[in-house]
Amino acid sequence: MKRFKIEKEHFGYKISEYLKEVQNYSGRGLRQVEVFLDGKKVRVTKQIKRQGILKVIEKEKETNIKPIKIPLDIVFEDEDILIVNKQPFLVTHPTKKKVDMTLANGIVYYFKEKDGKDFVPRFYNRLDMDTSGLIIIAKNSFAQAFLQNFGDVKKYYMALVHGIINEDEMTIEEPIGRVGDSLRREILKDGQYAKTHVKTIKRYEKSDVTLVECELFTGRTHQIRVHLSHLGHPILGDKLYGDKPDDVKRQMLHSYKVSFVHPRTKEIKELEIGMYEDMKSE
Protein backbone atom coordinates (compact mmCIF):
# COMPACT_ATOMS: atom_id res chain seq x y z
CA MET A 1 0.00 0.00 0.00
CA LYS A 2 1.18 3.50 -0.88
CA ARG A 3 0.11 6.64 1.01
CA PHE A 4 0.29 10.13 -0.53
CA LYS A 5 -0.60 13.49 1.02
CA ILE A 6 -2.75 15.63 -1.27
CA GLU A 7 -1.84 19.32 -1.12
CA LYS A 8 -3.54 22.44 -2.49
CA GLU A 9 -1.33 22.52 -5.58
CA HIS A 10 -2.90 19.22 -6.65
CA PHE A 11 -6.46 20.61 -6.76
CA GLY A 12 -8.02 20.14 -10.19
CA TYR A 13 -6.05 17.00 -11.04
CA LYS A 14 -7.91 13.81 -11.70
CA ILE A 15 -6.52 11.12 -9.40
CA SER A 16 -5.18 9.29 -12.47
CA GLU A 17 -3.40 12.47 -13.61
CA TYR A 18 -1.96 13.06 -10.14
CA LEU A 19 -0.63 9.49 -9.93
CA LYS A 20 0.92 9.64 -13.41
CA GLU A 21 2.28 13.19 -13.43
CA VAL A 22 3.25 13.66 -9.78
CA GLN A 23 3.93 10.12 -8.55
CA ASN A 24 5.17 8.66 -11.87
CA TYR A 25 2.72 5.77 -12.17
CA SER A 26 2.34 4.22 -15.62
CA GLY A 27 -0.98 3.80 -17.40
CA ARG A 28 -0.63 0.05 -17.08
CA GLY A 29 0.13 0.39 -13.38
CA LEU A 30 -3.09 2.35 -12.82
CA ARG A 31 -5.11 -0.58 -14.15
CA GLN A 32 -3.79 -2.71 -11.30
CA VAL A 33 -4.69 -0.51 -8.31
CA GLU A 34 -7.54 0.46 -6.02
CA VAL A 35 -7.55 4.01 -4.61
CA PHE A 36 -9.00 5.41 -1.40
CA LEU A 37 -9.33 9.11 -0.57
CA ASP A 38 -9.52 9.66 3.20
CA GLY A 39 -10.60 6.05 3.63
CA LYS A 40 -13.34 6.10 0.97
CA LYS A 41 -12.89 4.06 -2.20
CA VAL A 42 -12.96 6.29 -5.28
CA ARG A 43 -12.38 5.99 -9.02
CA VAL A 44 -9.14 7.20 -10.56
CA THR A 45 -11.24 9.53 -12.73
CA LYS A 46 -12.35 11.50 -9.65
CA GLN A 47 -11.17 15.11 -9.56
CA ILE A 48 -9.19 16.26 -6.53
CA LYS A 49 -10.94 19.18 -4.80
CA ARG A 50 -9.57 19.11 -1.26
CA GLN A 51 -6.56 18.13 0.80
CA GLY A 52 -6.42 14.63 2.18
CA ILE A 53 -4.67 11.28 2.25
CA LEU A 54 -4.70 9.13 -0.88
CA LYS A 55 -4.08 5.42 -0.38
CA VAL A 56 -3.16 3.25 -3.34
CA ILE A 57 -3.42 -0.53 -3.02
CA GLU A 58 -2.04 -2.77 -5.74
CA LYS A 59 -4.08 -5.78 -6.74
CA GLU A 60 -2.14 -8.96 -6.05
CA LYS A 61 -0.75 -10.65 -9.13
CA GLU A 62 -0.39 -14.40 -9.34
CA THR A 63 2.85 -16.24 -9.94
CA ASN A 64 3.52 -19.80 -11.02
CA ILE A 65 7.07 -19.70 -9.67
CA LYS A 66 7.49 -22.34 -6.99
CA PRO A 67 8.89 -21.11 -3.65
CA ILE A 68 12.18 -22.90 -2.94
CA LYS A 69 14.54 -22.13 -0.09
CA ILE A 70 17.74 -20.76 -1.60
CA PRO A 71 20.27 -18.65 0.35
CA LEU A 72 19.95 -14.98 -0.60
CA ASP A 73 22.65 -12.35 -0.13
CA ILE A 74 20.44 -9.29 0.36
CA VAL A 75 22.38 -6.06 -0.14
CA PHE A 76 19.48 -3.62 0.18
CA GLU A 77 15.74 -3.74 0.86
CA ASP A 78 12.96 -1.27 1.55
CA GLU A 79 9.26 -1.14 0.71
CA ASP A 80 9.90 -0.63 -3.02
CA ILE A 81 13.25 -2.18 -3.92
CA LEU A 82 15.13 -5.42 -3.25
CA ILE A 83 18.75 -5.77 -4.37
CA VAL A 84 20.57 -9.07 -4.08
CA ASN A 85 24.09 -10.25 -4.81
CA LYS A 86 23.58 -13.24 -7.10
CA GLN A 87 26.07 -16.03 -6.66
CA PRO A 88 27.69 -17.56 -9.75
CA PHE A 89 26.19 -20.72 -11.30
CA LEU A 90 22.66 -19.63 -10.35
CA VAL A 91 20.03 -19.02 -13.05
CA THR A 92 18.14 -15.76 -12.52
CA HIS A 93 14.65 -16.79 -13.68
CA PRO A 94 12.98 -20.12 -14.60
CA THR A 95 13.33 -21.21 -18.22
CA LYS A 96 11.99 -24.14 -20.23
CA LYS A 97 15.11 -26.12 -19.36
CA LYS A 98 15.50 -24.86 -15.79
CA VAL A 99 12.17 -24.51 -13.98
CA ASP A 100 13.35 -24.49 -10.37
CA MET A 101 16.36 -23.77 -8.14
CA THR A 102 16.65 -20.29 -9.65
CA LEU A 103 17.08 -16.93 -7.96
CA ALA A 104 13.40 -16.20 -8.63
CA ASN A 105 12.39 -19.35 -6.73
CA GLY A 106 14.46 -18.20 -3.77
CA ILE A 107 12.94 -14.71 -3.81
CA VAL A 108 9.38 -16.07 -3.93
CA TYR A 109 10.23 -18.32 -0.95
CA TYR A 110 11.78 -15.39 0.96
CA PHE A 111 8.62 -13.29 0.73
CA LYS A 112 6.34 -16.25 1.39
CA GLU A 113 8.15 -16.82 4.69
CA LYS A 114 8.46 -13.11 5.49
CA ASP A 115 4.99 -11.83 4.59
CA GLY A 116 2.94 -14.96 3.96
CA LYS A 117 2.12 -13.71 0.45
CA ASP A 118 2.81 -14.83 -3.10
CA PHE A 119 5.36 -12.43 -4.56
CA VAL A 120 5.89 -11.67 -8.24
CA PRO A 121 9.61 -10.91 -8.85
CA ARG A 122 9.87 -7.89 -11.13
CA PHE A 123 13.48 -8.03 -12.27
CA TYR A 124 14.88 -4.74 -13.53
CA ASN A 125 18.00 -6.51 -14.74
CA ARG A 126 19.04 -10.13 -15.13
CA LEU A 127 22.43 -11.80 -15.16
CA ASP A 128 23.66 -14.85 -17.06
CA MET A 129 23.99 -17.99 -14.97
CA ASP A 130 27.78 -17.70 -14.66
CA THR A 131 27.77 -13.94 -14.04
CA SER A 132 27.66 -12.86 -10.40
CA GLY A 133 26.63 -9.66 -8.69
CA LEU A 134 23.89 -7.11 -8.15
CA ILE A 135 20.35 -7.63 -9.39
CA ILE A 136 17.58 -5.06 -8.84
CA ILE A 137 14.05 -6.32 -8.14
CA ALA A 138 11.07 -3.96 -7.97
CA LYS A 139 8.66 -4.99 -5.21
CA ASN A 140 5.61 -3.41 -6.84
CA SER A 141 4.42 -2.13 -10.22
CA PHE A 142 4.89 1.50 -9.13
CA ALA A 143 8.61 0.96 -8.47
CA GLN A 144 8.96 -1.11 -11.63
CA ALA A 145 7.47 1.59 -13.85
CA PHE A 146 9.50 4.34 -12.16
CA LEU A 147 12.81 2.50 -12.59
CA GLN A 148 12.06 1.78 -16.23
CA ASN A 149 11.04 5.34 -17.09
CA PHE A 150 12.73 7.68 -14.63
CA GLY A 151 15.23 5.59 -12.65
CA ASP A 152 18.38 6.67 -14.55
CA VAL A 153 19.82 3.27 -13.61
CA LYS A 154 23.57 2.91 -14.10
CA LYS A 155 25.23 -0.52 -14.06
CA TYR A 156 28.94 -1.26 -13.66
CA TYR A 157 30.74 -4.58 -14.04
CA MET A 158 34.20 -5.95 -13.36
CA ALA A 159 35.64 -8.39 -15.88
CA LEU A 160 38.89 -10.31 -16.20
CA VAL A 161 39.91 -10.59 -19.84
CA HIS A 162 42.57 -12.39 -21.83
CA GLY A 163 45.54 -10.27 -22.87
CA ILE A 164 46.89 -6.88 -21.83
CA ILE A 165 44.73 -3.91 -22.81
CA ASN A 166 47.02 -0.96 -23.49
CA GLU A 167 44.35 1.74 -23.46
CA ASP A 168 43.36 3.20 -20.08
CA GLU A 169 39.81 3.93 -21.25
CA MET A 170 37.71 3.41 -24.36
CA THR A 171 34.11 3.47 -25.49
CA ILE A 172 32.77 0.70 -27.70
CA GLU A 173 29.78 1.53 -29.89
CA GLU A 174 29.04 -1.49 -32.04
CA PRO A 175 25.56 -2.81 -32.96
CA ILE A 176 24.71 -6.28 -31.68
CA GLY A 177 22.38 -8.78 -33.31
CA ARG A 178 21.37 -12.41 -33.26
CA VAL A 179 22.08 -14.76 -36.14
CA GLY A 180 19.26 -17.24 -36.72
CA ASP A 181 18.21 -19.25 -33.68
CA SER A 182 21.69 -19.31 -32.18
CA LEU A 183 22.24 -18.28 -28.56
CA ARG A 184 25.33 -16.41 -29.71
CA ARG A 185 25.19 -12.69 -30.51
CA GLU A 186 27.49 -10.91 -32.97
CA ILE A 187 28.48 -7.46 -34.17
CA LEU A 188 26.07 -6.80 -37.04
CA LYS A 189 25.56 -3.67 -39.12
CA ASP A 190 21.79 -4.00 -38.85
CA GLY A 191 21.89 -5.01 -35.18
CA GLN A 192 20.69 -2.99 -32.19
CA TYR A 193 22.73 -0.01 -31.04
CA ALA A 194 24.98 -0.94 -28.11
CA LYS A 195 27.40 1.18 -26.08
CA THR A 196 29.90 0.06 -23.43
CA HIS A 197 32.54 2.15 -21.68
CA VAL A 198 35.64 0.19 -20.68
CA LYS A 199 38.18 1.38 -18.11
CA THR A 200 41.37 -0.53 -17.34
CA ILE A 201 41.72 -1.17 -13.59
CA LYS A 202 44.80 -3.40 -13.40
CA ARG A 203 47.15 -5.21 -15.78
CA TYR A 204 48.51 -8.60 -14.71
CA GLU A 205 51.56 -8.86 -16.96
CA LYS A 206 52.73 -12.27 -15.71
CA SER A 207 49.41 -13.99 -16.33
CA ASP A 208 48.58 -11.92 -19.45
CA VAL A 209 45.25 -10.82 -17.98
CA THR A 210 43.59 -7.41 -17.55
CA LEU A 211 40.96 -6.38 -15.00
CA VAL A 212 38.51 -3.89 -16.51
CA GLU A 213 35.44 -1.97 -15.39
CA CYS A 214 32.57 -1.89 -17.88
CA GLU A 215 29.71 0.59 -17.74
CA LEU A 216 26.61 -0.28 -19.74
CA PHE A 217 24.77 2.48 -21.57
CA THR A 218 22.45 0.00 -23.28
CA GLY A 219 21.24 -3.42 -22.20
CA ARG A 220 21.71 -5.84 -25.09
CA THR A 221 21.93 -9.56 -24.44
CA HIS A 222 25.56 -10.60 -23.76
CA GLN A 223 26.63 -7.00 -24.53
CA ILE A 224 29.83 -6.88 -22.47
CA ARG A 225 30.85 -10.36 -23.56
CA VAL A 226 30.32 -9.55 -27.24
CA HIS A 227 32.07 -6.16 -27.11
CA LEU A 228 35.13 -7.42 -25.23
CA SER A 229 35.44 -10.43 -27.53
CA HIS A 230 35.19 -8.09 -30.52
CA LEU A 231 38.14 -6.16 -29.09
CA GLY A 232 40.17 -9.36 -29.10
CA HIS A 233 40.03 -9.60 -25.30
CA PRO A 234 37.37 -12.20 -24.44
CA ILE A 235 36.40 -12.70 -20.81
CA LEU A 236 38.20 -15.50 -18.99
CA GLY A 237 36.04 -18.61 -18.81
CA ASP A 238 33.62 -17.44 -21.51
CA LYS A 239 32.98 -20.62 -23.48
CA LEU A 240 30.57 -18.95 -25.91
CA TYR A 241 32.64 -15.95 -27.00
CA GLY A 242 36.16 -16.93 -26.00
CA ASP A 243 38.57 -18.40 -28.54
CA LYS A 244 41.38 -19.05 -26.08
CA PRO A 245 41.41 -22.24 -24.00
CA ASP A 246 41.51 -21.85 -20.21
CA ASP A 247 40.59 -23.91 -17.18
CA VAL A 248 38.41 -21.23 -15.57
CA LYS A 249 35.10 -22.69 -14.38
CA ARG A 250 32.93 -19.67 -15.22
CA GLN A 251 33.09 -16.38 -17.08
CA MET A 252 34.88 -13.81 -14.93
CA LEU A 253 32.17 -11.16 -15.01
CA HIS A 254 30.69 -9.50 -11.92
CA SER A 255 28.01 -6.80 -11.55
CA TYR A 256 29.68 -4.82 -8.77
CA LYS A 257 27.96 -1.43 -8.68
CA VAL A 258 24.56 0.10 -9.45
CA SER A 259 23.08 3.55 -8.98
CA PHE A 260 19.52 4.73 -9.52
CA VAL A 261 16.98 7.38 -8.58
CA HIS A 262 14.84 5.95 -5.79
CA PRO A 263 11.14 5.89 -6.79
CA ARG A 264 9.90 7.25 -3.46
CA THR A 265 12.59 9.61 -2.16
CA LYS A 266 13.79 10.70 -5.64
CA GLU A 267 17.33 10.61 -4.23
CA ILE A 268 20.22 8.87 -5.98
CA LYS A 269 21.02 5.52 -4.38
CA GLU A 270 24.39 3.86 -5.07
CA LEU A 271 25.44 0.38 -3.97
CA GLU A 272 28.77 -1.37 -4.46
CA ILE A 273 30.01 -4.84 -3.54
CA GLY A 274 33.31 -6.67 -3.86
CA MET A 275 34.21 -9.44 -6.28
CA TYR A 276 33.99 -13.14 -5.51
CA GLU A 277 37.23 -14.86 -4.56
CA ASP A 278 37.58 -16.61 -7.92
CA MET A 279 37.99 -13.21 -9.63
CA LYS A 280 40.73 -11.91 -7.36
CA SER A 281 43.62 -12.59 -9.72
CA GLU A 282 47.27 -12.37 -8.78
Feature locations, PLM:
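RNA pseudouridine synthases
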Residues: M1-E282
